[in-house]
């Protein structure tokens, strides 16, 4: 079991939680980004720097992740692809992306994108909050407890 992070847009607070968790739980954590990432020195944490371009980091995560892995991303199309491979997604606000819910979430995302393009709806998600950070921490802990107890 490994944790992959779509790191370019991942909030700093979430990365810090992931660093501490990877070292405490001794779980492999890989941040994938198209820019340099400053990470703590740990045998459990590394980075993969990909080239610039649309979906380059996403494609690398899809290529490398395996069934049972956890992918941290707010990118719903990426979450759909990794769920198809048997991985689970977790967004920085603590929402899990699973086989049971990803198609509905993807449909809602596509609808909202159309409404924004038509000018019917404006704006995006609220700013990342302390409650989001707590929700993320709780879901991460639950997922790891379930996954690591199966090993």
UniProtKB/Swiss-Prot annotation:
CDD domains hit by this protein: PIN_YqxD-like (cd18720)
Similarity field: Belongs to the UPF0178 family.
A UniProt-annotated Pfam family: DUF188
Protein name listed in UniProt: UPF0178 protein Desal_2673
